UniProtKB/Swiss-Prot annotation:
The keyword Membrane does not apply. Residues 75-196 form the HD domain. SMART domains: HDc. Belongs to the dGTPase family. Type 2 subfamily. It comes from Desulfatibacillum aliphaticivorans. This is Deoxyguanosinetriphosphate triphosphohydrolase-like protein.
Length: 351
């Protein structure tokens, strides 16, 4: 029996009957020989961590554009916090931690530069149905490894596709909107817990809002400190979830659901749409819009940038189609977009 097979047997012996054991994965688009040491989901997690897209998350916006402070979240730190929260919930419920972690680490790989402002630009210039979750699937399926993709398992791909959607329903009842595995559904909740808590923490740290402005009901239920918010929401999910009519349901109590909606509404009205944040996103949208048009009309510049970003199977021959330019823009970090915009559109002193 290999080390991998021992892991798989341990999962079968320990995990909840509602968990997704590695040995029962539906597999990959392109079949591969199994690893003698790692399970399928462990391999997926490792492939994501070693991907270019994952490394680029460190220079992509969470809420505040290119923050100068050392303690503000980036898209990478957000991803790591989601993974930690999701693993904690999965462990408490005897779900597959490796699958949970892989989905959590991959859920934002397709996020645009400048956060959701960048996503709005690509909706307008490329296609109204563009979303960072769909772009994350493109990243792992056909952009990473110079067009080869990461060839992840069906379960991880499904979880990435079904993670939370901004101002949408926290836990929709429609089966088509939630992941097919309990692990994927845990990541959806963990994503929301993470951004509600850390976006509020960053907003208070930056001075965009004060502690006194936070709805008193939210403070009473969740606590004042960042760690109190996270712990309270995690415990509520763990204690509220469980078996119902022969099926496991991932949910929070009605009281917690209402508080989370109240806090999310507060963040949208007072942080995400605050003038100091919105005005910077307006500038970011201008940068990405002009870069999009520039690369659509400059083949050589597009191919050079695609080579730098290590996109496509043959970036030196790639055509600047709308899809390809969208892939290029979405792959950029805030820093790359800013420096490239400056190089292209700002005059260079001759002497």
């Amino acid at each position: 029996m290999t080390i991998r097979e021992k892991f798989e047997q341990r999962e079968l012996d320990f995990l909840s009957p509602f968990a997704c054991p590695s040995a029962k994965s539906k597999g990959r688009k392109r079949p591969e020989a199994p690893c003698p040491i790692r399970t399928a989901f462990q391999r997926d997690r490792d492939r994501i961590v070693y991907s270019n897209a994952f490394r680029r998350l460190k220079h992509k916006t969470q809420v505040f554009l290119s923050p100068l402070g050392d303690h503000y979240r980036t898209r990478l730190t957000h991803t790591l916090e989601v993974a930690e929260i999701a693993r904690t919930i999965a462990r408490a419920m005897r779900l597959n931690e490796d699958l949970t972690e892989a989905v959590a680490l991959g859920h934002d790989l397709g996020h645009t530069p400048f956060g959701h402002g960048g996503e709005t630009v690509l909706k307008e210039l490329f296609h109204k149905d563009f979303t960072h979750s769909r772009q994350s699937l493109r990243v792992v399926d056909c952009l990473e490894r110079r067009g080869e993709g990461l060839n992840l398992t069906y379960e991880v791909m499904d979880g990435i596709a079904k993670h939370s959607k901004g101002f949408g329903t926290i836990m929709p009842n429609d089966a088509g909107e939630v992941a097919s595995t309990m692990e994927g559904r845990v990541v959806r909740v963990a994503d929301i817990i993470a951004y509600l808590s850390h976006d509020l923490d960053d907003a208070i740290r930056s001075g965009v809002v004060t502690r006194d402005q936070v709805p008193s009901h939210c403070v009473e239920v969740l606590g004042e400190r960042h760690r109190d918010l996270v712990t309270t929401m995690i415990r509520d999910v763990v204690y509220s979830s469980g078996e119902e009519d022969g099926q496991m349901t991932i949910k929070m109590s009605d009281a917690m659901h209402d508080v989370m909606l109240e806090l999310r509404t507060f963040l949208y009205n007072n942080v995400y749409r605050a003038p100091v944040v919105h005005n910077e996103f307006v500038k970011a949208k201008k940068i990405l819009s002009e870069l999009f048009d520039y690369y659509m009309n400059n083949v050589d510049a597009f191919q050079k940038a695609a080579i730098e970003q290590e996109l496509f199977a043959s970036p030196e021959h790639a055509a600047p189609t709308k899809q390809n330019v969208c892939d290029l823009i979405a792959s950029m970090t805030d820093r790359f977009a800013l420096t490239r915009y400056q190089k292209i559109f700002f005059p260079t002193p001759m002497v």
